[in-house]
A protein has these predicted regions:
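N-terminal twin-arginine translocation
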Residues: 20-26, 35-52
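A cross-kingdom marker for long, charged
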Residues: 49-70, 75-123, 127-215, 219-360
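N-terminal secretory signal peptides
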Residues: 1-23, 33-37
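Generic secretory/membrane-interface signal
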Residues: 4-5, 14-17, 42-44, 63, ...
Length: 360
């Protein structure tokens, strides 16, 4: 187990350990607006309408639960909005597993039901990225990290509340460097965040999976954008020469980091603005199935597009640590480099209008 993956058992429900908690200097670098930033202009009421019908997801979630025996169903089921739902995270270390029923605990038919459930809300690209994150558990073991303890199937499926056309309930896929929370209200999908596809290593250079790159677009588009800015705009966008080494918007602080810092989109050229929105949609749209993706794209654009801010941290040098944040009227995106070579990356996307099914 690597130092950067270590957290204590008390961290399971959202408390961040000394290896994952951003220190005070990092918080100040990211912007001095962590306090009092929960009310974001343009967010309140933005998620009153659902994103898409939850009918198929409800049917497939019921089918998944029906395919489990009583003990497995109990393992996969939790109350709505309890400590497990609120205590999301994407951390992972071999000795402790996530709440829910793990793939490694399912038989082949149950796995098929689980993947069919995921396919109702995730695009083929999203499913591939999730599988890539899972595959990296094998890569870590090949590198001698967690041998005999990690598994590409140590990822949990969990249902929160009762799948129904009325009321509120949720579904979650969670494991090391992977987190997807979906919340439903009265037959509608209302929230698709937090969403995290993280990785270690991002670029696999040896072994059976050599050539695999998990967060290629997340890195390439952001580096291209900061590199395309002239010196003056780069100076506005770069808030620190020191990269951020982790996300700041962790469990319980999802809305605490929404103050806009960095370079506003109003100062970008048309081509640069297009790059920025490609980057945003990589995090918030492209991993989702249609028509959910179309509805999510429309929600993102309900705010002021010109007021979206892009903030960069660290150098823009290949294979060197970097970080960035993108903040809009109703969302925040973060990427941090845990290691100096930009191989261990943590990312997050939050819909600030509807965090875990709770409206702003």
């Amino acid at each position: 187990m690597s130092r950067n993956d270590s957290i204590s058992r008390n961290d399971l429900h959202g408390e961040i350990s000394r290896h994952d908690r951003p220190d005070r200097r990092r918080v100040l670098v990211a912007g001095s607006a962590l306090v009092g930033a929960s009310v974001i202009p343009g967010v309140a009421g933005a998620a009153e309408a659902g994103l898409a019908s939850a009918a198929e997801l409800t049917v497939r979630t019921r089918a998944f639960l029906a395919g489990l025996d009583q003990d497995k169903r109990k393992t996969a089921s939790f109350e709505w909005d309890g400590k497990e739902w609120r205590g999301w995270n994407y951390f992972g270390f071999p000795s402790v597993t996530k709440p829910g029923l793990r793939l490694e605990q399912m038989d082949a038919a149950q796995k098929d039901l689980g993947w069919a459930l995921l396919a109702t809300v995730m695009s083929p690209e999203g499913l591939k990225k999730a599988r890539n994150v899972m595959t990296l558990q094998d890569v870590l073991m090949e590198l001698g990290d967690g041998v005999g303890q990690r598994s590409p199937e140590r990822f949990s499926f969990a249902v929160y509340g009762t799948p129904s056309d009325t009321g509120v309930w949720g579904f979650r896929l969670e494991g090391h460097h992977l987190h997807q929370s979906i919340a439903m209200r009265d037959g509608q999908i209302v929230s698709v965040s937090p969403s995290s596809f993280s990785c270690n290593p991002n670029r696999v250079t040896s072994g059976r999976h050599a050539g695999l790159v998990t967060l290629q677009a997340e890195e390439a588009l952001a580096r291209r954008l900061i590199g395309d800015l002239g010196p003056r705009l780069q100076g506005r966008a770069r808030l620190s020469n020191t990269p951020i080494d982790n996300i700041l918007s962790y469990a319980g602080r999802e809305r605490a980091n929404g103050r806009k810092v960095g370079l506003p989109a109003s100062e970008l050229s048309s081509a640069q603005s297009d790059l920025l929105w490609q980057l945003i949609e990589i995090y918030a749209v492209d991993h989702l199935s249609s028509p959910l993706a179309s509805a999510q794209k429309a929600r993102l654009r309900t705010g002021d597009r010109e007021a979206v801010h892009f903030a960069w941290y660290g150098p823009n040098t290949p294979e060197r640590a970097f970080g960035y944040r993108v903040i809009g009227d109703g969302f925040v995106i973060e990427l941090g480099s845990v290691d100096p070579a930009a191989q261990h990356l943590h990312t997050i996307y939050h819909d600030l209008s509807n965090v875990l099914g709770r409206q702003a």
